[in-house]
Amino acid sequence: MSEATTSTETLQDEAVLLVGHGSRREKSNEQVRELASELEGRLGLPVDAAFLELAEPAIDEAIAGLARTVSQVSVVHLSLFAASHVKNDVPLAVTQAREAHPELTINNGAHLGVHPAILDLLDDRVAAVEAELGVDRTDDEVAVVVCARGSSDPDANADVHKLARLLYEGREFGRCEASFIGVTEPLLDETLHDIAKTRPDAVAVVPYMLGDGVLTGRIKDGAREFDAEYPYVDAAPGEPLGTDNRLLDVLGDRWQEARTDS
């Protein structure tokens, strides 16, 4: 990343560390770096990327590098949910970094979570599926499934249900359900079979994932298999969140919250 700074005095000695999970698929890691670069342009200060596992640099290594050039680092999580990594792994790494660099102020931010920009992005993903299937929520019965990876953490799963409910509110969907590809219930297959009983005109299955990885592929396959099994219901999968600019809105808000303790 460039060592860009702003003319605002309070930001001249500050940097952001965007923490992604890390993957064996380099494409997924590049997504984190791409978002870091775009966030740097948005905020006008240095933004570096770090990873929890499977990719480099690790959090401690990245913070050590930043400690040489700035006096304040705000850690921002590129995580959809507040599961164990957000609740345990990152805070531990931040605590250790504070001990290693007592001269450095390190702020630990929140995960992406539930945010109006994400709801807007999900709505657009559904609209793209409607266009593909030739249906319109105002004239046709369109059901939506928001499908996430599933977690052993109840807070993470609750966020998916909340997102599905908020996506339904104020929009003309027939129904909007939360489902999961593993770990917890309801699983995608059972959710789709339950929806089929009501015979909607179309079902849009939206992967609540950042990238187009293995789990996103399973979600898309599940939607296509359902479409083949139920000829009286048109179904198709949407795209994951990707690197849409609206994620920068969320990350920018999480950065501001982290550095101001709000």
Language-model region placement:
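Active-site-proximal alpha-helix that buttresses catalytic centers in soluble enzyme cores
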Residues: 1-262
